[in-house]
Amino acid sequence: MAMNCEGEYGHLIMQDLILPATHSAPEVMASYARFGRRIHWVDGNNMPGAFQMNTCWWYKPNREQILSNPKSQVGKPHHHSYPEILGFYGSDPENPYDLGGEVELFINGESHILTKSSMVFLPPDVPHCPLYVNRVDRPIFHFSVVMNNLYTFDGERKFTAE
């Protein structure tokens, strides 16, 4: 896997988007592009030894798109056998705590409305989602970090960069 920097530690620096096969399918990328843009996806496949993290910008609401797609991974509750942290950040440098929109996240069936920049810790096996972007006034930066080398649901389905 080619990385972007040279030198002894250049292989530890990712500057391009390298998605797992399941996320790089044209229909998946087109669907995501309707409301946001992925920036990076790091995992044990494209950076051996790394835990999984992905980043993106959200530009438009996604609620209707999620509700109309029964295959959406964030449209239904799921859990992981490892902890996860979700981050949601507004893009106004003068007011960094203003999310610049509204995100709704369900944790074990309980709805949480986020309008401030937030980090959410999800312990192992805690059901979470749906995750809806209800309103976007300014771009919202989102990330997900899981303490596992691959992103899996319910301990079953693995997303790998084949």
Question: What positions do the PLM features span?
Answer:
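Double-stranded beta-helix
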Residues: 2-16, 20-21, 131-162
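Ordered hydrophobic segments in well-structured contexts
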Residues: 52-58, 84-89, 119-121, 141-144
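A short beta-strand-loop-beta hairpin characteristic of the jelly-roll/cupin
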Residues: 88-115, 153-157
